[in-house]
């Protein structure tokens, strides 16, 4: 391999995940960290470590100059951005490549295209992906907006062209609200992302969030690794993910998988990507593409046996895809619980010292986490501290194993979301697989959370 030393431009469990894949390939690792993460597990385990700034992300994990300097002084020949932070920053990818450092990610132009939600929708349509009815591009004129909304049919949703996470999104149920809500969505988008551009789509009543994992070699070859169901969400943030989806048939998987793989091949896409759809009444509607590794990638690894991070590194190194589409078999069922350092019912962050820690174990149980007893969870970053991934031959068997694994997980000191997951696993709707993206918030409201 040409890659001998890899800089990990991230923190937490994903930094550790990348380190593990690199070491299994005989590649040295460089950890970059803020002062708040000096004692983090990935920093302890890496072959080299460089402090790149104070705790605030803008001064450390988003500090492009500091990261490039760290790569140069440690002679790193590749950078893996993980997820979040700079992972979908096309300018950063260009700067990395301009410094003759291998970028472990898609081509910068594809990151840029898919990062602009309007351009992404246009591109997806041109590639043959099914779209939600709505505007072809940005909407600024109220009369035009009313005509689009009438054609799509109320209710409609107004969305920010840049960013996500629920900011700059407004649901409109009638023409009289439209102008006000467009202004509100634009203001929110401007404040959050520096871009007031918005567009309009048909608002689906009770959809599921289904996403397909794709991989391309950048040379016109691409595969899909099936779907994940990420419908259990709170405020547009995923809580639990499973693969395969309880509602997608093998025929649907093959049909949509073929469509997304062809789209990526036609695009010349390189590396890992996720194409997200809303699914309702048997129909798929493209919402966005993430040009990076996803938090929930382990459930796909569990049912396919493909190491996605290893594949990312191989492709960035110029090697072909290690598997062909016909080699991929979908076996069994996997569920991931995101364990956050927060109150399980109020969702208030709960940073601080971990006084004791014991990871669940046993057959087909995986825990991705950098926690250890005595570690202090910093208050500056995302609250996710661990991912519990469980595999079973059937969905029912997987759920039973997950219940057992959650009983075994011990994290004392901070409050965690473990009790939330335990409660979810007793709910008839979850057990039957009958839930939509609205289900979790409605369930929490009924509980008074």
PLM features: residue spans?
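Active-site neighborhoods of enzyme catalytic cores
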Residues: 155
């Amino acid at each position: 391999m040409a890659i001998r030393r890899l800089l990990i431009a991230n923190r937490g469990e994903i930094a550790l995940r990348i380190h593990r894949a690199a070491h299994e390939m005989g590649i040295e690792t460089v950890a970059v960290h803020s002062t708040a993460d000096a004692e983090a597990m990935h920093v302890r385990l890496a072959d080299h470590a460089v402090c790149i700034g104070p705790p605030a992300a803008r001064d450390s994990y988003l500090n492009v100059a500091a990261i490039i300097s760290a790569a140069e002084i440690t002679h790193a020949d590749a950078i893996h951005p993980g997820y979040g932070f700079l992972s979908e920053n096309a300018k950063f990818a260009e700067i990395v490549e301009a410094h003759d450092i291998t970028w472990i990610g898609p081509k910068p132009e594809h990151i840029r295209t898919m990062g602009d939600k309007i351009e992404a929708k246009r591109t997806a349509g041109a590639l043959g992906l099914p779209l939600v009815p709505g505007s072809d591009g940005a909407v600024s004129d109220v009369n035009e907006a009313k005509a689009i909304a009438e054609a799509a049919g109320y209710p409609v949703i107004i969305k920010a062209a840049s960013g996500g996470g629920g900011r700059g999104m407004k649901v409109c149920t009638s023409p009289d609200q439209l102008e006000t809500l467009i202004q509100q969505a634009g203001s929110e988008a401007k404040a959050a992302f520096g871009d007031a551009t918005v567009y309009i789509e048909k608002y689906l009543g009770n959809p599921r969030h289904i996403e397909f994992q794709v991989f391309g070699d950048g040379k016109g070859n691409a595969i899909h690794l099936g779907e994940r169901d990420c419908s259990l969400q709170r405020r547009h943030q995923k809580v639990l993910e499973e693969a395969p989806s309880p509602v997608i048939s093998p025929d649907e998987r093959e049909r949509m998988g073929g469509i997304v793989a062809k789209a990526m091949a036609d695009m010349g896409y390189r590396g890992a990507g996720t194409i997200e759809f809303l699914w309702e009444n048997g129909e798929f509607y493209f919402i966005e593409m993430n040009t990076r590794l996803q938090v929930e990638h382990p459930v796909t690894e569990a049912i396919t046996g493909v190491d996605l991070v290893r594949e990312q590194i191989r492709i960035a190194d110029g090697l072909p895809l290690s598997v062909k589409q016909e080699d991929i078999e979908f076996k069994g069922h996997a569920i991931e619980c995101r364990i956050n350092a927060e109150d399980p019912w109020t969702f208030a962050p709960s940073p601080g010292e971990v006084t004791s820690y014991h990871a669940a174990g046993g057959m087909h149980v995986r825990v991705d986490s950098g926690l250890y007893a005595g570690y202090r969870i910093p208050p500056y970053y995302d609250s996710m501290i661990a991912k519990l991934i469980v595999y079973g031959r059937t969905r029912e068997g997987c759920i039973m194993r997950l219940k057992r694994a959650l009983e075994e997980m011990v994290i004392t000191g901070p409050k965690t979301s473990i009790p939330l997951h335990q409660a979810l696993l007793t709910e008839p709707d979850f057990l039957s697989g009958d839930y939509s993206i609205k289900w979790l918030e409605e369930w929490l409201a009924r509980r008074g959370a």
